[in-house]
From Swiss-Prot:
It comes from Methylibium petroleiphilum (strain ATCC BAA-1232 / LMG 22953 / PM1). This is tRNA-cytidine(32) 2-sulfurtransferase. Binds 1 [4Fe-4S] cluster per subunit. The cluster is chelated by three Cys residues, the fourth Fe has a free coordination site that may bind a sulfur atom transferred from the persulfide of IscS. Its EC number is 2.8.1.-. The gene is ttcA. Keywords: 4Fe-4S, ATP-binding, Cytoplasm, Iron, Iron-sulfur, Magnesium, Metal-binding, Nucleotide-binding, RNA-binding, Transferase, tRNA processing, tRNA-binding.
């Protein structure tokens, strides 16, 4: 943990507040990550996790939290940190190896010049992120096999998942999000996202507290995905206007009612018949719905029962 310096004229109580807040944040992060791991059975006995570390705040936090949980988890598992050096201009090659070595973490740096490929294929002025991501994914799948990893851990957080949901809804005309656990495209690997319940602002605060050596994600000079950027701003505006809204939306991802949507593949609308029996979950379209009341101070996630994966102390 980073040291807390007491400035002249600052009382002991005032000086202790940053440490108190950092401890609260640490407990919350470890609880939410532990809850996600337990809810989706992300880590099993004997697993070897390949933790993908890009040098951004999210992947640093993921590795940091997993290392802590490894010491107190109810099962044994190992991990190896992997970074893909895509030979972007001015990429500080020394930063991640030095950091990972200082943490005593087994790591592997994969050197692949995908930057040149993307620059050659993508027209000038167009975003390179999509092709870059596909190339990176294929390489990481290969590396996972070579390292004998049983799971691939990625640093996507709650806000990433909500952004993906709305991106697919607004621009893809489908209800599809970003799952916390899935089988890879090639069918050979299980991919997990232990930060699925963690809001981005907590990761920003944790990165500042832990003073991670952040590597900027704009080295390639590519423009950020404009659609995702717009969605992210929309979600931030909603949360500012209605605190707790993002928590509720995140909880809704795990509380789907197919009978009240329109997908005939998920619910037998065409063969539906009256049964003569009352249905507590039936149509309440004309009723006042208590679930539409403003959220309380505590989110659904915060109020969830603890599980044995949760960080202690």
């Amino acid at each position: 943990m980073s040291a807390v310096v007491i400035e002249p004229g600052v009382t002991q109580r005032q000086a202790g507040k940053p440490a108190f807040e950092a401890n609260k944040l640490s407990k919350r992060l470890h609880r939410l990550v532990g809850q996600a791991i337990g809810d989706f059975n992300m880590i099993e006995p004997g697993d070897k996790l390949m933790v993908c570390v890009s040098g951004g705040k999210d992947s640093y936090a993921l590795l940091d939290i997993l290392l802590n949980l490894q010491q107190r988890a109810p099962i044994d598992f190992s991990l190896v940190a992997v970074n893909l050096d895509q030979k972007q201009p001015d990429f500080p090659e020394h930063v991640l190896p030095e950091y990972l070595a200082s943490r005593g973490v087994p790591f592997h740096i994969e050197n692949q010049d995908t930057y040149s490929i993307v620059k050659r294929v993508v027209p000038e002025g167009k975003t390179m992120c999509s092709l870059c991501s596909r190339l990176r994914r294929g390489i990481l799948y290969r590396v996972a096999g070579e390292l004998g990893a049983t799971k691939i851990a990625l640093g996507h957080h709650r806000d990433d998942m909500l952004q993906t949901l709305f991106l697919n809804m607004f621009f893809g005309a489908k209800l599809k999000g970003m799952p916390p656990k899935l089988v890879s495209d090639d069918g050979r690997h299980v991919v997990i996202r232990p930060l699925a319940y963690v809001p981005e602002h907590d990761l920003e605060a944790w990165a500042a507290h832990r003073q991670f050596p952040i590597i900027p994600c704009t080295l390639c000079g590519s423009q950020e995905n404009l659609q995702r950027k717009q969605i992210a701003q929309m979600l931030r505006d909603w949360e500012r206007q209605h605190p707790g809204r993002l928590d509720n939306m995140a909880s809704a991802l795990a509380n789907v009612v197919p009978s009240h949507l329109q997908d005939r593949n998920l619910y037998p609308f065409t063969t539906l018949q009256a049964t003569g029996r009352a249905d507590e979950l039936g149509d309440k379209a004309f009723d006042d719905d208590e679930t539409c009341a403003p959220p309380g101070a505590a989110s659904v996630i915060e109020a969830a029962m603890p599980i044995r994966w949760h960080g202690q102390g």
